[in-house]
């Protein structure tokens, strides 16, 4: 059974994807010599296709990520989302730093999403790398801060607040259609002390 993060599970995978998941570098070397292009997506199922490097990042397979990069995989290509965002959720700071150069190309919404990815992946250790890449909590962390408060994640909420998250962030979205702030979200939350 092959698991690729939250993307899905498969009993079998195409040859290249299986070699990546099995860390079969010998098989990949043979495939590369036979003309494998690491910059072509692999169809995993009817609706899911991923780049080879993307599979390794989703699996947080650091040696395979390095292998694929050393063999010419383009870090700027991804089917799901920019690899910096995937790494922020699925990997540690070492891998996030590999893709930090993508920060300059991200839209403001994608930069906000970076902190949501940190929250979803429970990877607060990646915040420092994102900030060093120019994606700062004080400018882009408000959405993740409000969500962390709403779900009672006091550790992440405190960390984001200490790093300058906007306590008054109140843009509406699908989860918070009434444009609530973190403070109004904290009031009914039993994890945060009242008083």
Task: Report the location of each language-model feature.
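Alpha-helical segment of the N-proximal tetratricopeptide repeat
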Residues: 15-22, 27
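Ankyrin repeat domain, specifically the short helix-to-loop turn at the C-terminus of the second helix
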Residues: 30-37, 66-74, 97-105, 128-136, ...
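Core solenoid repeat modules with strong leucine/isoleucine-rich periodicity
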Residues: 85-96, 100-102, 109, 113-121, ...
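Ankyrin-repeat boundary/"N-cap" motif
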Residues: 6-18, 41-54, 77-86, 108-118, ...
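Ankyrin-repeat helical core positions
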Residues: 5, 20, 32-33, 57, ...
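Conserved ankyrin/ankyrin-like repeat signature
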Residues: 27, 63-64, 94-95, 125-126, ...
């Amino acid at each position: 059974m092959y698991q690729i993060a939250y993307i899905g599970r498969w009993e079998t995978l195409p040859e290249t994807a299986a070699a990546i998941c099995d860390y079969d570098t010998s098989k990949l070397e043979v495939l590369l010599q036979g003309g494998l292009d690491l910059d072509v997506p692999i169809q995993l199922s009817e609706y899911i296709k991923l780049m080879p490097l993307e599979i390794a990042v989703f699996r947080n397979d650091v040696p395979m990520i390095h292998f694929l990069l050393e063999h010419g995989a383009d870090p700027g290509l991804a089917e799901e989302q920019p690899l910096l965002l995937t790494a922020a959720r699925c990997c540690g700071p070492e891998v996030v730093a590999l893709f930090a150069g993508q920060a300059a190309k991200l839209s403001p919404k994608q930069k906000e999403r970076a902190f949501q990815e940190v929250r979803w992946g429970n990877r607060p250790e990646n915040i420092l790398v994102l900030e060093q890449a120019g994606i700062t909590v004080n400018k882009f962390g408000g959405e993740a801060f409000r969500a962390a408060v709403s779900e009672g994640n006091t550790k992440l909420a405190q960390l984001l607040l200490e790093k300058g998250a906007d306590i008054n962030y109140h843009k509406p979205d699908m989860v918070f259609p009434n444009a609530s702030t973190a403070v109004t979200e904290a009031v009914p939350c039993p994890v945060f002390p009242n008083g």
